[in-house]
Each structure stands twice: as structure tokens, then as C-alpha cells.
Amino acid sequence: KNNIEVFCKRNANTPRIALCMNIKINTQEAVPGVEGVMARLFLQGTKNRTAEQLAQELDAYAIEFSADAKADYIRLKFVCLNEDFAKAVEILEDVVKNSTFDDFEKELKKMEGELIAELDSPRAKVYDKYYGKLFENHPYGTTSTKILENIKNITHEKVLKTYDAFLNNSKKVIAVVGDIESQEVENVINNAFSSLPESVDNPSKCSKPELLEN
């Protein structure tokens, strides 16, 4: 429903199910790093669960859950036991629909420290400079250095604005793999996400990266 594409592959006789939800925001990132901060805050509490309650519930059901920002999309994924698929989707639904983003300052400071520590590695510095130069002036060139240079421009308001685009101006795709029938997947997904705004595949406003000869 809502034009959300759902792909399901059944792997019989396997004990766990994996789900990946990819959401491509149709607008260019307002500030380098703002989508990364938003993704980190998805696991820091919702209107229904505090961060501690969320962590405890994921641990109690042995659900591996993560959210991260890629160059082209936001990825939320989990791996759960077969019998806990509906519970894992319910938690995903809560995170997607009801995240509060209350720990913004704390998470921003934490991310800044992690990026600085990451750049202590010579290997990381090489990759950082390589991609920064290769995709200069393009979102693919959003490196740790570029995020650190712009980190003071990342605000709570911009995170909320990005979240609005995440919900209302984005293409949404869900993939599920495990020992589960496609009809059951469809029923659970529809029940959880039928109220989400429609998935829209607007042409990207990001320019195509160009490799220039020296």
C-alpha cells in the first residue's frame, strides 16, 4: 500500500528473519551530516518508549536493530527470530513514526567525538581525502571532515525538517528474507505502515557526479 514496494524471499528452515527498510529522501541534504544525526536518534527514544525501554525490549527479544544514513538513502534494518517478526515490525513502526529526537545535543556531541577519533586512523584519512576530492561539491563527497566542518550548522530544527521529508517526500522500499510466507509479510507490513505518507519517487535534485580530467 501507499506505493511502498515490498520484496520477500523465503528461505525455508532458517531460524531468523531479516528486514531492511530503505528510504530515499527526494531533497538534497540541508547540511552535511544532518541525516546521519537523524538516523542515530532513531534509537534514542519514541513517544511510546524511552531509549532505555527500547534497548531493553530489543534485548529481551534478541532483535538486532540498526539505523544509518547512506549517501543515497536512510537504512533501518533488523534481524529477529521467526516467531518475533510481528513484534520487530511493531518496534520498527514505532521508531519510524514516533521518534522524538530529544537527545539531539548529546548525540551530536557523541558523533563529533567519534568522527574525530575515526580520523586518527591514517587509512581513514586517506579514504576521507580521496572521496572528498573525487566527489567534491556533491553529496557523495560528504566525508567525516566535511561533516566536522559543518557540524555547528546542524540544528535540532534541521533534523526535524529532514524527518518531515523522510516521511512525506521519499521513496520507501522494504525487503524481507527468512522462513516466512509472503502473504504474512504483506499483512504485517500493511498493518504497520498503511498510515505512512505515500512513497513518491521524485527525480533526485542532486546533480550527477562528474569526474573531471586533470
Where are these regions (language model features)?
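Short, polar/flexible loop-turn hinges at active-site or ligand-entry regions and domain interfaces
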Residues: 45-48, 97-103
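Acidic/histidine-enriched alpha-helical segments
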Residues: 56, 99-116, 181, 200-212
